[in-house]
Amino acid sequence: MSMRAPQLDWLRPGQGSGLRFVTAIGIVAVFLQVTLIPRFDIGPFAATPNLVVATVVAVAAFRGVVVGAIFGFTAGLLVELLSPGDTLGVLAIAYVAIGAWCGRFASGSEPIGRVTAVLLVVAAAALVPIWLGTVGLLRGEGPPVGYLLGHLVIPQIVLAPLMALPAWWAARRLLGAPREVEPWLVPT
């Protein structure tokens, strides 16, 4: 029994809502982040490039605020569940804010180019350690501000462009042109 072309439309990248590919991109990004991406130790700086932040920015830019926020929450929660950490949900909240913010930024009249995407990833990657440090300070166990900025934020800013373009390319290839997707609305 052979399948006709219309039955295979959901397998083609860029067709439909792309939510299957959003799920696949998220699972691959979280898996790579938790297992394969190396930790760089350069002098006093030690950091791991954040592929999940770059993927959240790319998905939010191509699918809008709602999908970006939901994707950010689930990716952040998966990273927290799969890697050792202390407080569950802190990273997920940061990724929700990043997904919603980047989705809102991308919903303008002009499509986002590669340079703007890299700048968004750099800004988002810098916000994650600031957020984690702020939550740590509120709990009374965070790092000093100088250490936070000098040893946590700057390495993320330097390493973020390494992850930005591969994540952007994968999202563009699999999701197609940017468009708003509301997952719970049924087309009429």
Task: Report the location of each language-model feature.
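Terminal, non-globular segments
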Residues: 1-188
